[in-house]
Amino acid sequence: MGKRMTARHSVFALLSFLLALTSSPAEAEMYVAGQVGLNLPHSLSNVEDRRGGVTFDENDQSLKSSVMYGAKLGYYFESLKWLGVETEVFKTTPYLTQQHVTTLGGINFLNAPGAHLSVLTWAPANIVVRHQMGAFEPYAGIGLGFNSSRLSVGRGTSKGGGPGLNTQLGLRYRITTNLAVFGEWKFNHANLEYTDFIFKGRDLSVNYNAHNVVFGVGYHF
């Protein structure tokens, strides 16, 4: 049921964004951009391991940094040049290090093996604001995110995902009227749920929080 609702919200957000694009004035400033950078995740928090009707609250689990890459598409309104809307997608692949796992109840598990985590984030409609200062444009944005994730331990892979929050703060520099480069700090929060994690009947829930320092190139129409 939750996955169906998330899918419906995703489709609705995409349709709303496309409708806004098609109904905007022809003079509206549109842009596309590519971005790449460094993902700096916090430890996974609020870790809940559920099996056999019992929930184990586990300690936070460390993640290593990774490369982040993605793309943006958006536009600024002609009547409100400081206000715009943007959709973006980006992927990170932080590594879950091998570490000792305990529960808040004091139960000690063996060392958990390392795991490969990938998180694909789609922010369908970030609201963005900017301040035009000649060639320089500081900007900020915020929006909901939808996250699709894979967690691989040994030969087993579990798929999951969940909603989240996406924020950004950056500085754009116009090389020409159409070509721009930018640097950006981005924060991503997500609650990730994995069903039948490693084996059937075991579910895992975690909070994923990460800073991203990115650079990119954009083309403005």
Segments from the language model and where they lie:
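N-terminal, post-signal-peptide region of Sec/Tat-exported proteins
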Residues: R51-V85
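Bacterial N-terminal signal peptides that target proteins for export
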Residues: G2-A13
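Bacterial N-terminal signal peptides
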Residues: F12-T22
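Short N-terminal segments immediately surrounding and downstream of signal-peptide cleavage
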Residues: Y31-S43
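Outer-membrane beta-barrel translocator domains and adjoining extracellular loop/strand segments
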Residues: L44-G53, T97-L104, S149-S158, E193-K200
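Sec/Tat signal peptide C-region and signal peptidase I cleavage site
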Residues: S24-A28
